[in-house]
Amino acid sequence: TSYPDPYYYDWKNESGSKVGIISYKSLFLANESDFSDHLNKSLRKIGLSPKTALISTLKNANIQRNLVEKFKKEKIEILITTTSFDSSLKKTSKDEINKFNLFEELNLPVLQILTSNRNKKEWNKSSIGMNSLDLLMQIIIPEFDGRIITIPCAFKETVSINENICCEISNYKFDQKGINWLVQLVSNYIKLKKLKNKDKKITIVISNYPVKNSRIGNGVGLNTPKSIINILNWFKDEGYLISDEDLPKSSRELMSMLIKTRTNDPLSMNNQPLDYLSLNDYELYWNKI
């Protein structure tokens, strides 16, 4: 059977906020649709309407334009993708780069689903998380698109062994715990979208490596303090509640605000702590993230 590219899979006429999903058609052709089916089922269970598109690649301008046209027509509110690498298109000529990008055209949050090339048992026994190949293909490169990295929702499990060719036959098996977490995140983003900016709360987290305050926000070749100030000013312009008194005027003023209390610098231990939380309260807040 021949299928179009993109192939719009398991679409239904149903109510609820619409969630775009992009996944590889090769998995469907290999009879590995369990993951997509369970993701769609879990989204529908909480009243959302999944719109799954199965593709061969994102490196094709016609495929990207088709996706944008279809998703805009459906008025999706968030996008989920399992595709690896980034979405930048190939050069259309020796001198020109095709600047069309479906994520920029859609202008929506894009959640990157992770699928581990290890089985669940190996994953649970390991302390390193994603292996180097998964890290490169599903986290490092996709982040150039501005995708929001999530957690593993499927693991590669051995389903049979072909003794004739001495080879294991593996399929991606969905992880219901991961899918439940992802579905709740999708729901939260959709709810957040409906709030006015003045009612939203945002945390900016920067690194605070031990030993020296000079390592706060450290990024080689990056001006982290200035970037934070630019972000805060953008938030203020977009209607987030930031008063002029709370807005640092310079990088120096921002860093002074950050180091006036305790940090990971041992010399700051005599400074006044910003606040205290009991372990129970901390775990309560952490589990709500």
Question: What do the PLM-derived regions correspond to, one by one?
Answer:
Residues 1-289:
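An N-terminal assembly and electron-transfer interface module characteristic of large anaerobic redox
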